[in-house]
A protein has these predicted regions:
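Alpha/beta-hydrolase active-site loop
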Residues: 142-161
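Alpha/beta-hydrolase fold active-site neighborhood
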Residues: 245-361
Length: 438
């Protein structure tokens, strides 16, 4: 009887579940259709597809047709990939101003930090000239900060008809840079900006990073790093054949002789190990085997960074043109280097020959500095104390009511709200909650 009773209850529950499913299914389907119908009213939107997600009620990928040159739409157009995580029309919206490609945001498990913290809609915008947002043909003259800001303005304009609530722009690293420059060009598009680890470089080789690396961490940490660099340079004759074999196996090609590439990997090492917060204790002793030393060098600053067909070519073009970059201090290593100078390595190693005469334009950095000094928009900058990019951060901004700069003690390029101390985290969250409730 008990078994029969349990069985009957299960049958009743199953039937109820089926009825419930039938009742609920059309509602979610109509909600899905409703979103697609709403966004399709914008004729510049095409190719809308639903995506699997475990983090949003609904998620879509779509393309916005954008002018190559927003000042001269007659020059042609390209399709920009946009990924939308939909929560609700009454929720705040986070626009992620990605600095590179958007491939990783397609993952079902992906959700950006702020959209999760505030249960907000997410609009993730792939940067022009990366992955599926690359124009055909690829004419580099239209890859400018101003055009990228105009792209974001067009995306925001398209989606504000759906999401009339508060808007936050955010991005990480180059995406943080993009969020900053977007606010400069269109200060009223969003209510709040949260750039993470965003540099503001003043030159192709900015000059502030090398002194930073001479001060960061402890003296013992810096000595261990430099000792490792010197050791792999001293053993270059022994390590270079294996380095070359690995490059050959991976079909890497470079714009400079292999020994120079090896030298640049060693120069890059100190920047890279601090940038990503690698445990200094993981650095091998100078007495370690050849294989141990080379494996560690390749893991921290491998040669793929310098290859001819780099997936980051679009970024190097932007860095050389107006975003700026960093240089290397070669003085401690000069006796062991095959190069006499590292100056202008970005143009020589990273850019195609026909672009090497491109001059750096300071107009953008001057415009951003002027904007930050004269204005006080609601912005939160987040940096890591040990991240070399912080050398070019806006940590000099003082005495602002709305602009806040947080530096995570001991933090790296991975500094986020979630990695902060409880005290810092509470301050950031309190600011954001207050602004969203205004």
């Amino acid at each position: 009887i008990l078994i029969g009773l349990v069985g009957s209850e299960m049958c009743i529950r199953d039937r109820f579940s089926i009825v419930l499913l039938i009742a609920v299914a059309p509602v979610s389907l109509s909600a899905q259709e409703s979103f697609i119908q709403k966004i399709e009213k914008n004729k510049s939107v095409s190719g809308i597809k639903s995506l699997d997600t475990s983090r949003f009620p609904e998620k879509y990928v779509m393309y916005l047709t954008q002018p190559l040159d927003h000042r001269h739409p007659e020059k042609g157009s390209f399709r920009q990939r946009v990924i939308v995580g939909h929560v609700g029309y009454d929720r705040p919206t986070v626009i992620v101003t990605e600095g590179y490609g958007a491939g990783y945001a397609l993952r079902p498990t992906y959700r950006e930090e702020l959209s999760e913290l505030f249960d907000a809609n997410m609009i993730f915008v792939e940067h022009r000239y990366f992955l599926e947002s690359t124009p055909e043909p690829c004419d580099w003259q239209y890859l400018t900060a101003e055009n990228s800001a105009e792209d974001l303005h067009a995306v925001t304009t398209a989606f504000k008809t759906l999401y009339p609530g508060k808007w936050i722009s955010t991005g990480i690293s180059k995406g943080g840079q993009t969020s900053l420059l977007y606010r400069v060009f269109f200060p009223d598009d969003v209510d709040v900006s949260v750039p993470y680890v965003a540099p503001l470089c003043y030159a192709r080789e900015d000059g502030r990073h090398e002194p930073f690396l001479r001060r960061v961490g402890t003296e013992a940490d810096r000595k261990k790093i430099e000792d490792f660099q010197l050791e792999v340079l001293k053993r270059k004759a022994r390590l270079l054949p294996r380095f070359e074999k690995m490059c050959t196996e991976k079909n890497y090609t470079f714009r400079a002789p292999l020994e120079e590439i090896y030298d640049f990997c060693v120069l890059e090492y100190s920047f890279s190990i601090w940038q990503w917060g690698t445990d200094i204790r993981s650095i091998p002793e100078t007495s370690a085997s050849d294989d141990t030393l080379l494996d560690h060098l390749l893991a921290i600053s491998g040669p793929s960074y310098f290859i001819v067909d780099s997936p980051n070519l679009s970024f190097f073009v932007q860095a050389a043109r107006e975003l700026g970059y960093y240089g290397y201090d070669i003085v401690p290593f000069k006796p062991y280097l095959s190069i006499k100078t590292s100056k202008d390595y970005l143009r020589r190693l990273m850019l195609p020959e026909d672009m090497r005469k491109m001059k750096f334009d300071k107009t953008l950095s001057n415009k951003i500095v002027r904007f930050l000094k004269k204005n006080d928009p609601k912005m939160i900058f987040i940096y890591g104390q040990n991240d070399p990019w912080t050398a070019a951060g806006v940590t000099w901004l003082k005495n602002k009511k709305n602009i806040h700069v947080f530096v995570e003690p001991g933090g790296s390029h991975l500094a986020r709200i979630g990695t902060m101390s409880e005290d810092q985290k509470q301050k950031v969250m309190s600011l954001l909650r207050g602004w969203l409730e205004e």
